[in-house]
Amino acid sequence: MHLVQTQSLNAGAPIGQPLLPIDYVPIFADPYITIQPFTKPSKTYDYWEEVIDLLLPVLNERGIKIVQIGGQNENKLPACVHYQGLTSIAQTNYLIKNSLLHLGADSWAAHAAGVFNVPIVCLYSNNKVSNVYPFWGNKTKQKLLTGVEPGTLPSYAME
């Protein structure tokens, strides 16, 4: 059961469409995709620079920039327009909502992209995807990648 369904059941409340706060922020790259590569250590993927190296030729050919979002202490990835630590949650929502695609690790930003029906490519590590996938949005626009084989249980990090 998805965590949203569990919370709804426990609260005795129906599931509705979330209304996320949105505040304007100037965008210095357009068109663009968003990337939030970092999250808690058990969900961190170590090869984002290689991913960007693979994506850049295709994105550059189409004039698409990469906007990195996240916390101020997170590493800056190469070839990105850096917004991490410079925006509020509402401003980050604005960036996600207006992007062509959201790419990242399992985090709140992937769920926000789902709410805004922005296409998603998201990496999952230690959570069972069927319990935590972006609940809202068109599922045909969501590519959820996991190293876990179908039908098996994920390994859980000790944090």
Segments and roles (model prediction):
Residues 1-159:
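Catalytic machinery of carbohydrate-active enzymes
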